[in-house]
């Protein structure tokens, strides 16, 4: 795990478009390299969206693997990039304006795997509370907590 964390740290120096292309390529490889997860995704889509063709399901599953891989590599920016760089890269345009949120409690939902850490950056501009589940791997748990608390 520490080697993977070191690799992520190195990747945070790359420009975002290059990091995105690498993430998409890694996701394509993961689609073929992890048949168990691919099968689970196909099963879920068959059950939830029986009207889709196999080609449509394959496209969705492939894009999921690519998006998930991109999000992991792009987290390196969120965790280690200088704050001025993050401010240039992240544009916060909330679907629910803060003025509307001040009328009472509001629950914001974020896709868990793809943008959870980006939502943490967004939380810096308005008061929010989050939920966190400790990870089994201590090195990974320490990294997630560091990245989300910075």
At which residue positions do the language-model features occur?
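Catalytic core of membrane glycerolipid acyltransferases/transacylases, capturing the structured
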Residues: 103-150
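Membrane-proximal helical "anchor" segments flanking the first transmembrane region
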Residues: 1-107, 113-115
